[in-house]
Each structure stands twice: as C-alpha cells, then as structure tokens.
C-alpha cells in the first residue's frame, strides 16, 4: 500500500479528457522498493485508465507506459531533468524520448508534476513552452498560435 506521505495526483477525466500521468514521490529508489512502487502505481493506473506512470524522487524521474509496464524515459532531477543516459544507452537514443520530445508530442495533453514551486526544473519547463501551471501542480503546454 502506498503511504499517505507520497503524492498521488489525479484529475477528473470529465474535466480533462486527456492522457493521464501518475505521480508518486519516493525518497529513494532501491530495486526492491522501486519495483513495489511501480507495481502499486500500475494497479492505480489500470483502475483509472491511465496511459502512463510517472515516478519522481529527489534524484530521478522515470516515465513508464502503463499498458506495457515498460520504461519510456528517465531523467536526472538533480540536473533539472537533463536526460540521464547511463542506464538507457546513448544520449541520441534517449533524446527521442527526452523531455523536449515528450512535451512537443503532447501538445494537448496534461502532464502531472510534483506541486513544489522550489524545484529547479520549473524554469526549464517554462523555457520548453510547458507553462500554464494549473492547480494541483499540473502544467500544460501552451497551444500553438
């Protein structure tokens, strides 16, 4: 069971009929704990018909496909979400699934982020055009003019 001190954010699907991304904040990832949290996240994702699971810790962020239960991308949160490629091979390979690619592909979709104004990646997201910080820590990409 996921403890209350971890954030789980959901929007009403009627209000936002778009892709759902689950957020879970954990203090650290050990393989055992990581697997446990992903299993729990995927259970919630299936119940909510979520497409992706996003797991955030102070050191890294991982985005998983809820349907295949396979990783899509990983970012090093300590460096403001610069692609973290040690586990995922070359930077070129990762860049296809990098934050820039994700935000450009999901023009009309919502991505959930931790509701914390002090984290360094907020400005990076704004520079990428991912602005419009909404309630519950959600940010949405600006529509193309």
Q: For each of these PLM feature ranges, what is it?
A:
Residues 1-52, 62-145:
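A short, conserved, highly charged catalytic patch centered on acidic carboxylates
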Residues 53-57:
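A structural signal for short, well-ordered beta-strand segments and their strand-loop junctions
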